[in-house]
Amino acid sequence: MSRDDNGWSKLYPDLLRSIFESLSCLDFHRAGTVCSNWYAVSRSCPLYPWRIVFRGKNSVLFDPIQDKIYTKNLLGIDLSKIHCLASYGNWILIVDPRLDFYLLNVFTRETINLPSLESSLRGDRPFRFIRNDDESGYFLELYGTKFLLTWNDFRFEKTAILWVNGRNGDYVVAWAIKQFYIFSYKKIGNDDDDKRWSITCTQCEDMAYKDNKLYVYTFDHYINILDFSGNSPKEPMEENPYLSHPFSFVDAIYKLRLAVTREGKVLIVLSLVGLDKKICIYKLNLKIGDWEIVESLGDEMLIFGHGVTIRAPDKDISGGGLKSDSICFLYDDYLSDHYLTMKRQPICGVFDLATSTITWHTRLEDLSSKICWFVPGCA
């Protein structure tokens, strides 16, 4: 039967969804690229996070549900000498010691080179990057004042977002440095004429991106919104409700991150310190004009610091806590008893929002501490 006969790809969505959910993760991604109908159905299937470990010239991908390990040579370079800043679906945003930025597909090994920092910058102020003499970084120059930006600046400060359209290859990248400068690049369609980073000056403790909007949390506890629907980011004309309702929280905060739900609701995710160590979530209730605690994420879960929620399995399939209402995190996202007692801490874990319990993940932790969560198929 030819592909044009009898609507070969138009199976009933429920049937197609059940088939998709029975596939291995790799076959699931291949099936989702067959046609637009299959892609649409694949987007309604539950997802779950994998882990990736960077070591030597190989990376290790771990599927926790199938309990399988895949070893890949991704770039042909020492992967311990790169920083992974963000991920989206099968793609990760990385920066190397020369401060060259790339997008990398961890399954196909496709690489997209982002513009050099030495290219001119978009913005309303005279910014420019100047390569350091020993090529260890760049000087960012503004009105004759310079400060040095190096690879080590990204070791702990990983405030960045990545969004990739899995069908047409469009993408948006943004990262912040010195907690006051946001650099962004947007590729839409085949427009490759203007390969320049845009620069926006704004306070930035964290940020999240969804539907052409970049949500930026400031040090005075407000959330700014930047509109990415045009060629360069701008503050939208419509009213920003978050500017009238700063987030005030009295308990001790270890880390704060933004996230946006699939419906577009902005969440503030807190990792707390003190006797009541836990992770909690808040959202703005516009009816009462105040922030309220989120008791449940419904059928969604999130990764601490990844900026968006994902649809998730209803039940814990593997015993690792990966299900709806759970939050995946890394060792430096949560101040655990291991840290306080100077014991060796597991590299990552999963926090159950309903029970405030943690399932620690120890598989692969002997390989490297350079590990991150990513969600295959999130596109």
Swiss-Prot record:
Protein name from the UniProt record: Putative F-box protein At2g33190
PANTHER family xref list: GENOME ASSEMBLY, CHROMOSOME: A05, OS07G0183000 PROTEIN-RELATED
InterPro entries named among the record's database cross-references: F-box-like_dom_sf, F-box_BR-signaling, F-box_dom, KIB1-4_b-propeller
Naturally occurring in which organism (per UniProt): Arabidopsis thaliana (Mouse-ear cress)
UniProt domain F-box: residue ranges: 6-53
Coiled-coil residue windows: none
